[in-house]
């Protein structure tokens, strides 16, 4: 048994020798017809087989039976063919020679077709096609293959279906993608799991065609259909950008002759950058539709592959198709995914992808390479889109690649009004549409947000009709959802209109995109809510509001008013309120930074936060940045503890320089101007120092009335008398606290009287704040700024005026105050 594994016939699973098993199976009875019966018999008679598992033994028995059956069938076939072989020996020799010759011909044909298909797929020049290819005739004879005439085989043994496949393959390789009449087309190739869609419309052909072609990243279906998509007329608020694109992009594509004549190279790349939702992708599609050239659209993440080298090959394939169909446009969305800075990349594959992208953008390759596409037919315009332009590799942003950068910033109030005009064209409006009002209610909204507002306004209009249908439904209670299935008669459809109120409600349902980018919602604080302060209002109108609303006039005179304001004074005087009112009046984007929220414990992160803050503000200019409690970031250098913010302070000074601001207006507020570094107080940074003192008697009365405007004040209450006679030294915050305490006293009194009475019903209309409630509140509230602090701030204002010698004039009319 130990030598069984070396027996003839080869070993099998379980240590069983095939020859031995076959001999043992011969001893079984003839009545055992199945493998299962043979296994049971062997296990019952032989102990070594009983020790094996039934499954292993059954597998080996079946293999032996299969070998026997195959041998039997082969022997029968040989017996049947003995006579035929003896009678046709010479014929078989001749047949063999014919088969060898035909096989050689087939291999040569296949090699020839593969070579020709490869040449057709690489070459884009019309001259590369022969006259026979232009006519659609394809030669597959041995003359075309070998260059000499060969005698045909005696018997044509090649499969007819195989010949048909060869002919179809060759004819499809000769078939051009589009005729010259259809060359002015838009082609959209969208790579999605190896599938590519190519949208094409000929100049004279409107019928839809479907064919198969390899896509940008692999083989896929190619759909050719009519051009559909956005155009330049679908945009609002970016007229200057559209004019620039028409001159620098569309004109070179549609009229290349002037550029060739004068020897000027057309633009090779455009980089769109801006916050999400501002229309970067839509604008790229509009360029392709306006130009009418092949358009290859791909997301950057679709290029990346897990196989080494496949990502680079996908990029080469994409640009190869673009250069073969030049002039064409390649659009790479979210290009920062494959074009990030190489020094920050951790993996070599990511660095190779960036390098391959740089190489492909430089041109179609080596002109000496016969397989390289010919770029003489035109050029390829590469468009990239990203909301992180600083993350791109610097080599991508040099001349010859993305040489033109267009910032699609968040729209201002006038631009939002133009966008709303475009969006409202598709809506069925009732009555006049006040686009200026909606634009004023939507600070920080981008184009996508305004489209969402229009969509939600339409839903509000439909819901209004649905609510009326619900109320008119019969109250039988059988089916309370029958209104969902009720048909819409024509008279009810005619009632569907979008009203102005629908837009106003929809605005509150959409979150501004800029709030996700670090911007703040522009506060709903108007100058009417800030009584007095005529001097401050004049300053803000002169240096912030008017330059934002009428920039052309200031630019014509060469006036540079990009200066900063530093509001200082006792706490609670309304410095923050004034800044919010100025931002609201200007209608610009608004960023509210609260003190030390930019500080970070990690080295370099605080400076990065400052750079990012101003970069976002410049991207979405005009923008107002308000630094509340700015003294936390501007502590004088050299003092104790100043080293914590020293690096941040230096970066802050650089960003505040007028040359770097570019329509970014800065307002700071502090109650400790003495600790601010003097470098911040020079012109061009916080150039205007405005002192906001405590209000006088008349101003206190104005503030108290503004605060009590939304409170149920009893008509018998003398607010003027309370403010002038009982609130000496009160700041705006103290007066707001006083009204709150009086309101709380009135509420407590009303609740106590309702609990003590037998009748639980309370008349809400009789709930008012009376004089006794204010008297009770006055006993609980005291001024937050004492006389010594007032003298300190007055002396500090005089000192700053003498040391700086600029606009530090004390405001003689104190601020009004209102609840936010």
UniProtKB/Swiss-Prot annotation:
It is found in: Nucleus; Cytoplasm, Cytoskeleton, Phragmoplast. Residues 76-87 have a biased composition (Acidic residues). The keyword Nucleus applies. GO terms for molecular function: ATP binding; ATP hydrolysis activity. Keywords: ATP-binding, Cell cycle, Cell division, Coiled coil, Cytoplasm, Cytoskeleton, Nucleotide-binding, Nucleus, Protein transport, Repeat, Transport. InterPro entries: AAA+_ATPase, AAA_lid_3, ATPase_AAA_core, ATPase_AAA_CS, CDC48c, P-loop_NTPase. Residues 97-119 have a biased composition (Basic and acidic residues). Probably functions in cell division and growth processes. Interacts with certain SNAREs as part of specialized membrane fusion events where vesicles from the same organelle fuse (homotypic fusion). This is Cell division control protein 48 homolog C.
